[in-house]
Amino acid sequence: RHFKHLSPWSRGVDTQLFCPREKITKGQGPIFTYMGRVAVEKNLPAFLDLDLPGEKWVIGAGPALGELKARYPQVHFTGPKQGEDLAVTLAQADVFVFPSLTDTFGVVLLEAMASGVPVAAYPVTGPRDIVREGVNGSLDENLRCAALRALKVSRVSCLEFASHYSWDVCTREFLNNLVPN
């Protein structure tokens, strides 16, 4: 209570690694993708049960992977990826679906946007703080509606939004808070 001059410092995204890439997949319609830990608390069935056109991809690993692979054989589970391989795979998506109801901030949202991929999520803390309707994605209590609306969002708009969260921008913001101009 005796603190003064407090300023938030945003998390950043590596916009050199996570950036738009050439499409190397030729799927059947749009690709809806989740990336992250494959665990119960991520609420993945809320995404995987959706009736969506095209394909569903899950990038990642975790304790629920085996069960979900058996339950959803039509879903493409890539397994864990990292670095360039992760960034290229993510950039193939047409929409990034974030079904979690409990994450306070998902860096994966920024990574998707930096890749030019709009986000579909529930309007809960975390996504609500960073997703702007029609600018970089869509929020809705009906995740299917959010995903379908996100398909119409400009990839360039997502990229422009994410550029404000590059590590360069976040570092300058942090340094300016330490030593104001």
Regions found by a protein language model. Name each.
Residues 1-21:
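Donor nucleotide-sugar binding/catalytic pocket of nucleotide-sugar-dependent glycosyltransferases
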Residues 20-57:
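Conserved donor-binding/catalytic core segment of Leloir-type glycosyltransferases
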Residues 101:
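Aromatic "clamp/platform" in nucleotide-sugar-dependent glycosyltransferases that forms part
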Residues 118-121:
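Short hydrophobic beta-strand element within catalytic cores of glycosyltransferases
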